[in-house]
Amino acid sequence: MSSGQNSGGLMSSAGLVRYFDSEDSNALQIDPRSVVAVGAFFGLVVLLAQFFA
């Protein structure tokens, strides 16, 4: 990539940050700990299924 070209990566990243940073009051609010707990639960279910299969 030549030093004269600007790929616009920084500008597009700034747009994504602005898009994902906006909070919608009507959006479903999920606690991050709940997501981790559900993922750990399903992981445990898969491990137990492999152990008993």
UniProtKB/Swiss-Prot annotation:
Domain of life: Archaea
TM ranges: 32-51
UniProt cross-references to Pfam families, sorted A to Z: Sec61_beta
Description of how the protein assembles with itself and partners: Component of the protein translocase complex. Heterotrimer consisting of alpha (SecY), beta (SecG) and gamma (SecE) subunits. Can form oligomers of the heterotrimer.
Role summary: Involved in protein export. The function of the beta subunit is unknown, but it may be involved in stabilization of the trimeric complex.
Residue runs in coiled coils: none
Subcellular location: Cell membrane
Single GO BP term: protein transport
Single GO cellular component term: plasma membrane
Extracellular topological segments: 52-53
InterPro entries: Preprot_translocase_SecG, SecG/Sec61-beta/Sbh
Organism: Halobacterium salinarum (strain ATCC 700922 / JCM 11081 / NRC-1) (Halobacterium halobium)
Positions on the Cytoplasmic side per record topology: 1-31
Family: Belongs to the SEC61-beta family.
Membrane topology label: Single-pass membrane protein
Keywords annotated in UniProt: Cell membrane, Membrane, Protein transport, Translocation, Transmembrane, Transmembrane helix, Transport
Protein name: Preprotein translocase subunit SecG
